[in-house]
Amino acid sequence: LPEESGSVSVEIVRQVSDETLAALTVLLPQLSASASSLTRERLETVVAAPGTELLIARTEGAIAGMLTLVTYTIPTGLRARIEDVVVDHSARGRGIGKALTATAIDIAEQRRARTVDLTSAPTKTAANQLYQNLGFTPRETTTYRITSTRPADSPNTRLAQQDESP
């Protein structure tokens, strides 16, 4: 990599630069209003995490989008998941999301992942159309989430309580 797609290039972030940190700091709020601010330390943790690839897309040299690909092994095999896909609002409709997602699929296939999953809000019409055009099919499933209320650096009391059971 980098992989070119028209005037869009996609690359895996191997080291955090000031440019990458600044661009992702602008992109993340466009993805989630509730996302906490991105620090260099957190971004370096993401980049260094085993099984996690942070992809960025450039157009005209500037970072205009990002995607995170996570691969993990479970008893049924190697799986992949696409998360945190966002293209800068000023650059949408130029094939950046397609280039990012296609590159992530290629990486997952090279690693022999059995499946690649992602979620997308039904209101994101263009994104859902893109994913279907790339071969994703909707699954009949319900996504559940529990949101932690404790700080990231606090001990996991639920597990600690289970360990202390008679």
Enumerate the language-model features and the residues they cover:
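Conserved N-terminal entry element of GNAT/NAT acetyltransferase domains
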Residues: 1-18, 149-166
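A short helix-loop-beta-strand connector motif used in the catalytic cores of GNAT acetyltransferases and
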Residues: 45-56, 81
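Conserved acetyl-CoA-binding loop-helix of GNAT-fold acetyltransferases
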Residues: 87, 93-106, 129-133
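Conserved GNAT-fold acetyl-CoA-binding loop/helix
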Residues: 15-45
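A conserved beta-turn-beta hairpin within the catalytic core of GNAT-like acetyltransferases
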Residues: 72-82, 92, 139
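Conserved active-site alpha-helix within GNAT-family acetyltransferase domains
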Residues: 98, 122-140, 145-146
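Conserved beta-strand in the GNAT
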Residues: 56, 62-71, 81, 86
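Conserved GNAT acetyl-CoA-binding A-motif
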Residues: 108-120
